[in-house]
């Protein structure tokens, strides 16, 4: 997914590293409820299930997934990074 051309400064950052399903999505849901329309929530995760759970969450609830990427952290472990804009 490529980066959009608008301001991507997150209103909320969630560190869900080390948490397993369903906790990352539950935390995202709480953050989205507390934010206002157009706000961006940034999520960092280590659970591979977020790679399909977060896109489904966005589609189902009408939020925009601006960024979904994965990379290796300093310990060579896979990490997931998301930017979600509240619809």
Language-model-detected regions and their locations in the chain:
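Intrinsic-disorder/low-complexity, polar/charged segments enriched in Ser/Thr/Lys/Arg/Asp/Glu/Gln
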Residues: 11, 38-42, 79-81
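Iron-sulfur (Fe-S) cluster-binding modules
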Residues: 1-2, 87
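C-terminal edge-of-domain segments
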Residues: 70-87
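An N-terminal amphipathic alpha-helical segment
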Residues: 2-36
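Amphipathic, hydrophobic secondary-structure cores in small proteins
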Residues: 22-66, 70
């Amino acid at each position: 997914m490529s980066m959009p051309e608008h301001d991507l400064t997150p209103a909320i950052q969630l560190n869900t590293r080390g948490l397993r399903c369903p906790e990352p999505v539950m935390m995202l849901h709480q953050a989205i409820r507390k934010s206002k329309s157009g706000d961006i929530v940034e999520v960092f995760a280590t659970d591979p299930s977020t790679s399909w759970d977060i896109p489904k969450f966005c589609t189902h609830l009408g939020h925009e997934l601006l960024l979904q990427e994965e990379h290796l952290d300093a310990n060579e472990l896979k990490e997931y990074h998301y930017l979600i804009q509240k619809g």
